[in-house]
């Protein structure tokens, strides 16, 4: 089953990432950031009667590559202008072709909350999300 395959790949990837960026350092960096980033995710979703979260996604296991040319910052800016309450950014690299840089750059560009979308299996990834600029996971 594809989900099992993705979870197993995620376990391997997270173990490798922990060798590059030590968990204690990532946790310390996350905890050193302000607890209120100015992008309260829940508040953004409660601002109107109808809200939407738009997704920035380059590929999926079922569809393959969705966008060969992937102007992720332009896409995110267009979502914000269109009235999105938040933006979901794929960071899973193997099956969705996501990248932490997409999250980092989008989070530093838009004024609405940004969600890290990945297969979260370890608290390490939660601290990564905070360091990378995510408002939610």
Where are these regions (language model features)?
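An N-cap/entry alpha-helix motif that binds or orients negatively charged groups
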Residues: 3-67
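Glycine-rich, proline-tolerant flexible connector loops at the mouths of alpha/beta enzymes
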Residues: 24-32, 60-66, 85-106
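Alpha-helix-loop-beta-strand connector modules within alpha/beta enzyme cores
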Residues: 36-43, 47-48, 53, 96-121
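Hydrophobic faces of well-ordered beta-strands that scaffold small-molecule active sites
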Residues: 52-56, 87-89, 114-117, 137
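Glycine-rich beta-to-alpha transition loops that act as phosphate-gripper elements at the mouths
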Residues: 55-59, 66-70, 93-97, 116-126
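Alpha/beta enzyme core
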Residues: 66-90, 109, 123-136
